[in-house]
Amino acid sequence: MFYKRDVSEYRQMAQGVRIKTLVFGEKTLLTEFRLEAGSTLPRHAHEHEQTGYLVSGSIQLTIGDQTYDAGPGDCWCIPGNVEHEGKTLADSVAIEVFSPVRKDYLPEAKR
């Protein structure tokens, strides 16, 4: 499966947080997050391992009890079932991979 970049199909996850599923396979799912300065992702946990790469901007991530300020080029790995949250310090773009596939992030036709 190949992905050709376009700006359609973003879904609003929270105020100032949009997500787009880029591509997925049997075991992984790749997403792009577009985050507006001041937006937050509340503390939560899920079964999926989550790895991320900050393309641009600045975010503050709390994973478990550790807090990190991430800038462009920084990466993270969140083990499954570990609580985490995020605060967007500047308009940002992040790429994240989830394993196993998050069914709630699949395009409507694939759920």
Where are these regions (language model features)?
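A cytosolic small-molecule/anion-sensing beta-strand core signal
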Residues: 55-56, 71-72, 90
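A short, N-terminal "cap"/entry segment at the start of jelly-roll beta-barrel domains
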Residues: 1-27, 107-111
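Anionic, Ser/Thr-rich low-complexity intrinsically disordered regions
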Residues: 31, 63, 95, 104-108
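Conserved short histidine dyad/triad with adjacent acidic residue
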Residues: 31-45
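Glycine- and acidic-residue-biased ligand/ion/polar-headgroup-sensing regions
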Residues: 48-59, 64
